[in-house]
């Protein structure tokens, strides 16, 4: 994912919203969008701001680290990664709270809700300004985080949970296309492919070309 960052730069920090846990705090969809999600995003952004302030103003990293001293990295090309995981769990919980059966990756209303959540996160990030992220217009970069070893029942980023993928690969690719645009600093998906593909690598290349 660091390939999405500026050459000669990097990320001060990566923090993440665990969207499923935020949804568990909500009484309903309205409460999620008006209270729970904004509260957690604000707390995380302030936490990231303080981490960045310390790194730049107090730690001495950019004055003492050999990478900076030898010109390999430059502070003014750094930004930060505003991460998220658990979109699938979040959407499914909110759908249940609204008395609806649709699930993320299989239902248009559920997928539309996922896009609505991403629009809210994107709007918050675009409104939040950090003085030391000037390389990216003063804003963090959104990042669909793949998870950590301790995660339980948390689906990475905006992925459809493993085992719940659509039967047709094209349907999964279309689903991905609705979310990938939000994440300049990285996102990823897992696609089940039949083992016989080893005999026909051109098939995979065609899928990649079609996906792009």
Regions found by a protein language model. Give the residues of each.
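Conserved catalytic cores of very large enzyme subunits
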Residues: 1-76, 97, 103-107, 111, ...
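Contiguous, well-ordered alpha-helical segments that form the cores/surfaces of helical PPI scaffolds
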Residues: 80-93
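Hydrophobic, structured segments
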Residues: 89, 102-103
């Amino acid at each position: 994912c660091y390939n999405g960052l500026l050459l000669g730069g990097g990320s001060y920090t990566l923090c993440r919203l665990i969207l499923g846990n935020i949804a568990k705090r909500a009484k309903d969809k309205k409460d999620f969008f008006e209270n729970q999600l904004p509260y957690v995003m604000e707390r995380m952004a302030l936490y990231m701001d303080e981490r960045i302030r310390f790194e730049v103003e107090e730690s001495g990293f950019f004055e003492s680290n050999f990478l900076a001293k030898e010109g390999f990295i430059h502070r003014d090309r750094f930004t930060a990664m505003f991460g998220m995981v658990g979109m699938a769990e979040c959407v499914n919980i909110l759908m249940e709270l609204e008395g609806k059966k649709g699930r993320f990756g299989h239902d248009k209303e559920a997928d539309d809700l996922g896009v609505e959540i991403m629009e809210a996160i994107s709007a918050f990030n675009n409104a939040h300004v950090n003085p030391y992220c000037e390389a990216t217009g003063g804003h963090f970069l959104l990042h669909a985080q793949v998870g950590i070893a301790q995660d339980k029942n948390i689906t990475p980023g905006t992925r459809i949970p493993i085992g719940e993928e659509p039967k047709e690969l094209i349907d999964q690719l279309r689903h991905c296309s609705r979310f990938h645009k939000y994440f300049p600093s990285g996102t990823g998906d897992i696609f089940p492919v039949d083992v016989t593909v080893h005999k026909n690598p051109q098939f995979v290349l065609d899928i990649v070309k079609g996906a792009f």
